[in-house]
C-alpha cells in the first residue's frame, strides 16, 4: 500500500527537481515558469497527501483554489512573455533587464 511517506518523498523530489531546474537554467524564461509551476504542484501534492492522511477535505479544496490561481498566473506570465518576445525578439533573461521609457 502506498503510504503518506511515499507521497511526501515524491513531493520533495519534484520540489528538488524544480529548484535544480531554476538554478541550472537561468537563461530561458519559459523553463523558469515551468520550474515554478512544478514547484507549486509539488507543494499541492503534499497538501493532498496530508489532507487524505488526516481525513480532512479542506486541504483538497484549498488545492483546487491554488490550482486555479496557478492557472491564472501561468496565463498572465505567458501573455507577458509573448509581448516581450514580440518587442525584443528574445526570451533570454539577461536581455530583459533594460527598461524603455
From Swiss-Prot:
Query: Which domain of life does the protein's organism represent?
Result: Bacteria
* InterPro entries registered for this protein in UniProt: NADH_UbQ_OxRdtase_chain4L/K, NUOK/Mnh_C1-like
GO cellular component entries: NADH dehydrogenase complex; plasma membrane
The kind of enzyme this is, by top-level EC class, is translocase
Topology of this chain in the membrane: Multi-pass membrane protein
| Biological source species | Methylotenera mobilis (strain JLW8 / ATCC BAA-1282 / DSM 17540)
Q: What is this protein called?
A: NADH-quinone oxidoreductase subunit K
Please state where this protein is localized: Cell inner membrane
Give the matching Pfam families: Oxidored_q2 (PF00420)
Q: What does this protein do?
A: NDH-1 shuttles electrons from NADH, via FMN and iron-sulfur (Fe-S) centers, to quinones in the respiratory chain. The immediate electron acceptor for the enzyme in this species is believed to be ubiquinone. Couples the redox reaction to proton translocation (for every two electrons transferred, four hydrogen ions are translocated across the cytoplasmic membrane), and thus conserves the redox energy in a proton gradient.
UniProt GO molecular function: NADH:ubiquinone reductase (non-electrogenic) activity; quinone binding
Gene (UniProt)? nuoK
Reaction(s) catalysed by this chain's protein: a quinone + NADH + 5 H(+)(in) = a quinol + NAD(+) + 4 H(+)(out)
